[in-house]
């Protein structure tokens, strides 16, 4: 049985390894009812600007296109054992980008880890703590 990532999550910036400037806050709301996944992010920078990202796709491996930061991102989601791989391609600021973001959920369902491997953000790990009460 695959993990259910549904919940409200807050990035633990101190426990994460982020490439580039760290945000002041990263909040993520996930709605996951297999095979549908919907992600809403609110990224607040240190100068208090907040950007919102909405993303939706299916975990069946079919391609989905979302508008992310004013660019079309093509993504494919698939299960790799108990990890969810979100593979995305985008052309951002005239650069072709490739991302392989592996999601894992702790056994107590309180910590979501998003780890980039073998991609343009290789080595970045975002650790998120559950902030909703029901899990």
Predicted regions and their residues:
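Hydrophobic small-molecule pocket/channel-lining residues, especially in calycin-type beta-barrels
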Residues: 1-135
């Amino acid at each position: 049985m695959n993990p259910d990532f549904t919940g409200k999550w807050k990035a633990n910036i101190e426990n994460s390894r982020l490439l580039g400037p760290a945000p002041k806050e990263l909040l993520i709301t996930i709605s996951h009812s297999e095979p549908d996944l919907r992600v809403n992010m609110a990224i607040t920078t240190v100068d208090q600007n907040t950007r919102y990202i909405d993303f939706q796709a299916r975990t069946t491996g079919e391609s989905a296109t979302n508008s992310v930061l004013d660019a079309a991102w093509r993504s494919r989601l698939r299960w790799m054992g108990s990890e969810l791989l979100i593979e995305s391609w985008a052309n951002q600021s005239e650069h072709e980008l490739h991302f392989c973001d592996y999601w894992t959920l702790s056994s107590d369902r309180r910590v979501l880890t998003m780890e980039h491997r073998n991609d343009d953000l290789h080595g970045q790990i975002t650790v998120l703590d559950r902030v909703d009460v029901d899990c």
